[in-house]
């Protein structure tokens, strides 16, 4: 009998240590490239004119003036009068879970069957042949974060992916990037479930729902930790707690292994969500949409919470009315410039022009009296979303040792006339506007010219 218990115990350990749906991402073949004489916005708040950038082995090697390389195999790109930036990162995307063409049978972003569906993962809905990926790549997007929708109080896990079209989602997943947890407050969950005659039907019902879920997660985690603290002998005669996929996700949040991203519009609700997080000892990474974030910008900065916001979209529903165009700038400049502002898309068209969205937000901020440089605004679509996705140590800025996610622009990236000419992911060319090199999805196969007469191009 003891031998049998030992075998069962060993099997339990093997199952627990297996990471489900791990990334199998492999980068494309990278090149050794020296960009010379370019104007660089490095994603760290610096503007460097007539500067060189060296990349090799998929990494940023050096940045500065007059870089010389003796290697005959190095490729020289003259970037004079052009601009170089880090690859753009969108922290709020639904590409893949709401793919194009938009048909009901592929609308897989909301598991609107229960107010709390922490057990679902956005990556399990993603269609890897969504033609929107390639269109985003043409706009300089090298990384994007896919979230479930906002029908539920707790909608499930989000995933960060590299913008390289592959045949499996695992081969697109950003290696070792943490999952996120998508939560939503306000009108959406109370409308979806209130219209069915069930809870929540009010904002107070929303908050009761969050707290109930976290209490369950705390109890589940306590049981797991109590079992883990037992001796090997005790584990051989006692069964571990029954596994629960929903509570697995929530307990991982409490262990700081999953990043919390919250769809929320009104200032007082964001403040209440911060209180809920403090009650259950987890951290909020970012509030998304947040049209009233400007009202509590200092509170967000004090708590290290980013505002992932639209540049100029509001008024489409009641809770989205009270916005100002300087919203992003105000969040950015909170507490003497210690705020974390992010420009997000939440839209398959907006993601193609996230640089222009940042330009609009910067212009509105400067019109309101803030002195925001292009270099500072570039952080809103590069290093700040990298921080919110938990991948800042690897990407988001042009710093030696980081991944060579690089965009070469035809001109000032904040100009509506500028286009991404070349996009590199991990030092490998992923898109070249001049030659037409780039991915073609299954949806585009058979079209003589995928760019012709396409609404989203």
Place the predicted regions along the sequence by residue.
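Polyanionic/metal-chelating signatures
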Residues: 132, 137-288, 419, 425, ...
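C-terminal cap of metal-dependent C-N hydrolases
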Residues: 38-41, 387, 399-443
């Amino acid at each position: 009998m003891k031998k049998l218990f030992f075998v069962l115990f060993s099997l339990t350990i093997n199952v627990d240590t297996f990471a489900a749906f791990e990334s199998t991402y492999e980068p494309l073949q990278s090149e050794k490239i020296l960009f010379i004489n370019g104007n660089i916005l490095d994603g760290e708040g610096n503007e460097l004119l007539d500067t060189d950038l060296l990349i090799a082995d998929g990494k940023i090697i050096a940045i500065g003036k007059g870089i010389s390389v003796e290697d005959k195999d190095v490729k020289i790109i003259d970037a004079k009068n052009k601009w170089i930036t880090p690859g753009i990162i969108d922290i709020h995307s639904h590409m893949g879970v709401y793919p194009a063409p938009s048909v009901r049978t592929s609308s897989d972003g909301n598991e609107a069957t229960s107010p709390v569906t922490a057990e679902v993962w956005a990556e399990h809905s993603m269609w890897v042949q969504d033609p929107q990926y390639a269109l985003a790549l043409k706009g300089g997007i090298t990384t994007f974060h896919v979230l479930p929708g906002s029908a539920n109080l707790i909608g499930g896990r989000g995933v960060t992916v590299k913008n390289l079209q592959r045949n499996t989602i695992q081969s697109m997943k950003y290696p070792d990037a943490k999952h996120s947890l998508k939560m939503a407050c306000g009108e959406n969950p109370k409308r979806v479930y209130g219209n069915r005659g069930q809870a929540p039907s009010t904002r107070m019902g929303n908050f009761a729902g969050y707290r109930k879920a976290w209490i369950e997660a705390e109890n589940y985690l306590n049981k797991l930790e109590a079992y883990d603290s037992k001796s090997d002998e005790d584990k051989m005669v006692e069964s571990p707690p029954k596994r629960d996929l929903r509570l697995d996700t929530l307990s991982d949040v409490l262990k700081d292994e999953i990043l919390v991203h919250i769809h929320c519009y009104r200032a007082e609700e964001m403040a209440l969500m911060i209180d809920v997080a403090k009650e259950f000892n987890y951290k909020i990474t970012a509030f998304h949409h947040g049209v009233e974030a400007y009202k509590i910008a200092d509170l967000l900065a004090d708590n290290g919470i980013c505002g992932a916001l639209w540049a100029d979209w509001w008024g489409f529903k009641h809770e989205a009315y009270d916005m100002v165009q300087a919203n992003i700038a105000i969040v950015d400049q909170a507490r003497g410039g210690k705020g974390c502002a992010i420009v997000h898309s939440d839209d398959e068209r907006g993601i193609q022009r996230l640089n222009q969205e940042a330009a609009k937000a910067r212009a509105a901020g400067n019109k309101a009296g803030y002195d925001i440089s292009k270099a500072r605004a570039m952080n809103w679509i590069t290093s700040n979303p990298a921080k919110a996705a938990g991948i800042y140590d690897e990407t988001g800025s042009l710093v030696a040792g980081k991944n060579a996610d690089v965009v070469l622009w035809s001109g000032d990236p904040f100009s509506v006339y500028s286009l991404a000419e070349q996009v590199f992911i991990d030092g490998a060319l992923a898109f070249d506007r001049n030659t037409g090199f780039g991915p073609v999805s299954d949806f585009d196969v058979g079209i003589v010219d995928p760019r012709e007469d396409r609404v989203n191009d």
